Design a protein with these regions (language model features):
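Non-transmembrane "mature" sequence context
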Residues: 86-87, 168-170, 182
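Short, structured motif recognition centered on aromatic/hydrophobic residues
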Residues: 25-30, 50, 54, 109-113, ...
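Intrinsic, low-complexity N-terminal interaction/targeting segments
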Residues: 1-27, 73-138
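Charged surface patches that recognize polyanionic ligands
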Residues: 43-46, 51-97
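Short cysteine/histidine-rich zinc-coordinating motifs and their immediately flanking basic loops
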Residues: 178-184
Length: 188
């Protein structure tokens, strides 16, 4: 059986987005190239870490002067994308492990997302993408530095668009309030 690898070597769009109300959101990555849209599901923390690591990698490459192309300090105005996810959102798989890389020759950032298999879910691990004993679907997206900066900006915006924090205990507030431990269980 051939395991699909969803590749977007020069995407028109690569974004993080959500479906659902705050507190019940499902997080997605979505890549689009030449009319083909690939969506994968992942955890909020994975979106947050991916955006942070992209920025860190670009900052490191920029500081070392290890790029053949200019790396912007922040997102470029012409690349800002606040549009929603392309609908319908049909996830190809749930993301377990992710990896980032920098292609020094081409000056491009490479993102790879590997499927969380049933065996991984049962063992409580995210699996090893190099383990050939398990067939894993994957998503591979190649981004310019500008596209990566925009992804990181939007990822931060999406992650922080959820529920606000309780001013007393810093736990997320549900629309109906919550039982605040610092206020001895009094609903806030």
């Amino acid at each position: 059986m051939v395991v699909p690898i969803f590749e977007h070597p020069s995407p028109d769009r690569f974004i993080a987005g959500t479906v659902g109300l705050p507190g019940e959101r499902t997080f997605f990555l979505q890549a689009a190239s030449e009319g083909v849209v690939t969506s994968v599901t992942l955890e909020k923390e994975q979106v947050e870490m991916l955006g942070e690591r992209m920025d860190e990698l670009l900052d490191m490459v920029r500081a070392k002067g290890a790029s053949t192309v200019p790396i912007p300090v922040g997102p470029l105005e012409e690349l800002i994308d606040n549009a929603g996810l392309a609908m319908p959102v049909d996830a190809e798989f749930i993301v377990g492990t992710m990896s980032l890389g920098w292609d020094t020759q081409a000056g491009l950032l490479i993102v790879e997302c590997f499927e969380l298999t049933q065996q991984d879910a049962e063992s409580g691990t995210s699996g090893d993408p190099d383990d050939d004993s398990q067939e894993r679907r994957s998503l591979k997206v190649t981004l310019t530095a500008g596209q990566a900066r925009e992804f990181a900006r939007r990822a931060d915006q999406v992650v922080n668009a959820g529920r606000s924090d309780c001013p007393f205990c810093a736990l997320p507030l549900d629309p109906a309030g919550h039982m605040c431990p610092r206020a001895n269980g009094i609903a806030r």
